Amino acid sequence: VLFELDAVLLAQGVEGIAVGLASKILPHNFNELIDASIAYLRGESFELYPDFPSGGLCDVTRYNDGLRGGAVKVRARINKIDKRTLAITEDPTHDDESIKESIIKANDKGKIKIKKVDDNTSDQVEIIIHVSNDESSDRTIDALYAFTDCEVSISPNACVIMDEKPHFMGV
């Protein structure tokens, strides 16, 4: 696939929908794409996994080379500022508004206990979470991953049009 797909397609990733057809190609690190291409040309084995430019953590255990049925679990990076303050500083999905809304919903449902959420995002993600006095920050972090969009599973679906027909392929 490395030679059939434009490197920009793999580097940037793509998501789109057509009539009866959908495609989701996750972004990859350009330098790793070059290294994989060189390994491929030399007949060497290589591994190539998604790399989200907006940071965060990524579990590729079930990636399955980008084929349908695979999945990638991604997590926002949550840092402790102090005992009662957390900061989300990296978001692989680059959808900080969804994260903020899911935190507020989880708090309203009693899944997490927070005082308030401040979204200071500009060029970089920065969502500040003020933890309730009767809750530990460690438990809040666990709950944020369990009950909000701070952790989501993404299923790749690499569908490309070749010879005027859709083809599903892996990386």
Question: Can you say where each PLM-predicted feature lies in the sequence?
Answer:
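Intrinsically disordered, low-complexity regulatory segments
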Residues: 1-171
